[in-house]
Each structure stands twice: as C-alpha cells, then as structure tokens.
Amino acid sequence: MAKVQPKNKAELLGIIEIAINSYSSNCDLNFIDTSLVTDMSDLFCGLDFNGDISCWDVSNVKDMSSMFMNSKFNGDISCWDVSNVQTMEGMFCGSKFNGNISSWDVSNVITMNSMFFGAKFNGDVSRWDVSNVKFMRHMFCDSVFNGDISRWNISNVKSMIGIFCDSPLMNKKPEWYSDDESDLLELLMKR
C-alpha cells in the first residue's frame, strides 16, 4: 500500500476510520506517514483497534492525551520517539495496553494526570526521566501497576493527588511520596 501523509489529526482520523472499516480493527496502519501530525489526543479512544502502528513517526506529536483511553490496543509502540510530547494525560486510562514502553523519552512531558488510571499496564517505567512533569494526579489510581518508580525525580511535580489510590502501590509507596500535598512542598524544599 502506498504511503499516505495526513497533515493533521482530522485527516489522520479519517484515514484510520476508512482503513478499519475496509480491513479490520486489527489492520496494519504503518502505511500512514504521521510525521506532520502534532495532536494525537483521543485518536483510538474507545476503539476496538489492536492493529500495527509500530512504525509510526510520532516525533512531532505534542499531545497524546487520552490516545488509547478505554481501548483494546496492546500493540508494539516500544520504538516510538515521544521526546516532544508534552501531555500524556489519560493516555492509557482504562485501556488493555501492557506493552514495553520502558525506553520512552518522556523528558518533555509536563502532564501525566490519569495516564494509567484503571489500566492493565504493569510494565517497567523505572528509568523514565519525569523531572519536567508537573502534574501526576491519579496517574496510577485504580490500576494494576506495581513497578519500581523509587528513583523518579519528582522535584517539579506540583500535584500528585491520588497518584496511587486503589492501586498495589498504596502498600509500597516510594520514599518521595507524601499522602498530603502540603507535605510534598516540604519534601521538595529539603532536596
């Protein structure tokens, strides 16, 4: 199939809809050159899609909020260059995704609110550079995530209300965690 290059999210959504309707929800979408797209928010939100998007060029994307929210997607996106993404809010919220994203460069992300809220994700994110993240509210709330994030640098986080509520991490919180956000300010001032 010939490469197709959408200029924006609206064009990309149209191409995805046609491909899924023509082939199946498990189709290969790597024929789409996504290098011009900067907004992928809500792209697969609520869809049954579980096809191949492993070769997508997402290097210019800034917004991935709710991209896979409540979706069945569980494909390989381990090689994605997410280094320019600024918001991943709700990206995998309520999704089935449990793939390898351990090597993602999230150093420019500012918002991770509800990123894995209610999600099946339990992968390794221990080496993520979250030093620029400011918002982690409900990030792992009601999820199965039980990984090691003890080395995360949360020095710029302004709010992490409910980050671990109803999750396995409630019982093994990292040393940097505080139940009270007013304590968080004190914790950060000691650093």
Q: PLM features: residue spans?
A:
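Negatively charged
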Residues: M1-R191
